[in-house]
Amino acid sequence: VLSAALFAWLLGAYYLIQPTREAFGISAGPVYELLWTGTAVATLLATPIYGWAVARFPRDRFATGLYLGAALALAGFWIAHGQTEGALRRTVGYVFYVFVSTLAVFATTLFWALMADGHRPDTARRLFGVISVGGTLGALGGSALVDALSDTLSPRDMILLGAFGYASSLFLLRPLLRSLPNTAPKTTGAHAPPLREALAGARLFAKSPYLLGIGLFLAGQTLAATFLYIESREFLFHALPTRDVAESVAQANTVARTSFFARINLAYNAIALLVQLFLVGRLVRWLGLGALLASL
């Protein structure tokens, strides 16, 4: 129960700030793709640091630091966005976009690492589906809250709500870590440098047809999703402009963008929940996992 509740809380916090991230990012207009490049570079740079920190610190201390650090950083963005204007404010929004995109990767990765360390394989098979449903419910709640409050709170204020969400997740994280039987790292010897471990992982990936197949599947899926994603943002950039317009119009259009993305997230997660609960198991039994993935 605590695992599902924590995942719901974390995804709820993320979906409180995700529409604001998108609304700010669209302001980049023709150079929107650079934000994706910035996210890729930031993720690549952060990965060895993340690997080093996971190897160096106990998981409970590192998890606390990551989620609390995320909350403090979001509070900093809330302050910075309120104290700037014009091009400088847009720049803060672009940095916020890259930060949130990178945070989403590591916050989710860390959660599932904790789950993998804390549950035996037989227990994991029974519980991980339930935990995933909990995350979807949290995403629904966060999206619904943004949509409900979009006429009352500004997109900037959603950042502060997200900061509160990540900070308050510690009240679920600490008892969860105490209840899991195996959250400590399994080895106590010297750890290999993160770069060496990354290279070893790359060699293993290149030698395994199974891993290569998964990689190609994910690459193709991501390529198609990226194309649709960028095209939809290009449409909104022109439909709801925030550049070269009056400040009041820019603010109103930013609010409209935020509400739009919240509703998209709400619909997406509602469909995902229905599929998780009623369709996935049946489709796997009827079609087989390979055919189901190919159809996607």
Question: Where are the language model's segments positioned?
Answer:
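Membrane-embedded alpha-helical bundles of multi-pass transporters/translocases
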Residues: 1-187, 192, 198-296
